[in-house]
Curated annotation (Swiss-Prot):
The gene is surE. Nucleotidase that shows phosphatase activity on nucleoside 5'-monophosphates. The keyword Chaperone does not apply. It is found in: Cytoplasm. It comes from Pseudomonas fluorescens (strain Pf0-1). This is 5'-nucleotidase SurE. Gene3D superfamilies: Survival protein SurE-like phosphatase/nucleotidase. It catalyses: a ribonucleoside 5'-phosphate + H2O = a ribonucleoside + phosphate. The lineage of its organism: Bacteria, Pseudomonadati, Pseudomonadota, Gammaproteobacteria, Pseudomonadales.
Length: 249
């Protein structure tokens, strides 16, 4: 099996190195990652300029693009042999609930949806590196164990690991996405010439974070696994919309 590894924190990120180290002695791995931090890039593709891969001394491939660019090229001709699976991470910071809409880590995994095996997105619920070994351990454990899975095509597994030592993790839970409250207002700054700018504020706290959600699992010390799909159709709205459209036709 050949795994394509990517991330959104950039090719020099410690989480990427930890993920590669955890998986490379298990199976063949190739790394294609953004040359700089692309957190929050979601599923954006670069369409206004060419992409130039750089082959680094450690064997990684650096790309002047987004996480989705990296996986897209990796699956469509940049590599001599197509990977069997895409694994993204390890992100420093949670990708819980609404975060998946913006996350480049999750987007990289979603770009691997056409492969026959499920893609994984791994995130450590911390900006600090102290418990990266915990996240790397569970990444290896879950990727190794995936062979017995019988999942629908185009399934992506979003995994969040609590910021705890390995022996403090209580287990692994299957969860749904929770929801965050609305983010705080952007922070306005004014430069010395009087020109206004804005910093995007931090994400909102968990608004729907009760039992069964990814938020609740990690707060209780469990690794959270949430299966994601690309189809965002809101089926519960069909009945209301059917009646509404009848009056318009």
């Amino acid at each position: 099996m050949r795994i394509l590894i990517s991330n959104d924190d950039g090719v020099t990120a410690p989480g990427l190195a930890a993920l590669y180290a955890a998986l490379a002695d298990y199976t063949e791995c190739v790394v294609i990652a953004p040359e700089q931090d692309k957190s929050g890039a979601s599923s954006s593709l670069t369409l206004d300029r060419p992409l130039h891969p750089q082959y680094l001394a450690n064997g990684f491939i650096s790309l002047n693009g987004t996480p989705t660019d990296c996986v897209h090229l990796g699956l469509n001709g940049l590599l001599e042999r197509e990977p069997d699976m895409v694994v993204s991470g390890i992100n420093l910071g949670a990708n819980l609930g609404d975060d998946v809409l913006y996350s480049g880590t999750v987007a990289a995994a979603l770009e691997g949806r056409f492969l026959k095996r499920p893609s994984f997105a791994f995130s450590l619920v911390s900006r600090q590196v102290d418990n990266l070994p915990t996240a790397a351990y569970f990444a290896r454990k879950l990727v190794e164990a995936h062979a017995g899975l019988d999942l629908p095509p185009r399934t992506v597994l979003n995994v969040n690991i609590p910021n705890l030592p390995i022996d403090h993790i209580r287990g692994i839970q299957l969860t749904r996405l929770g929801h965050r409250a609305r983010a705080a207002a952007p922070m306005k700054v004014v430069d010395p010439r009087g020109k206004a700018g804005y910093w995007i504020a931090a994400a909102g706290d968990a608004e729907d974070g009760g039992p069964g959600t990814d938020f609740h699992a990690v707060m209780q010390g469990y690794v959270s696994i949430t299966p994601l799909q690309l189809d965002r159709t809101f089926n519960d709205a069909f009945r209301s919309l059917d009646g509404w459209l009848e009056g318009l036709n």
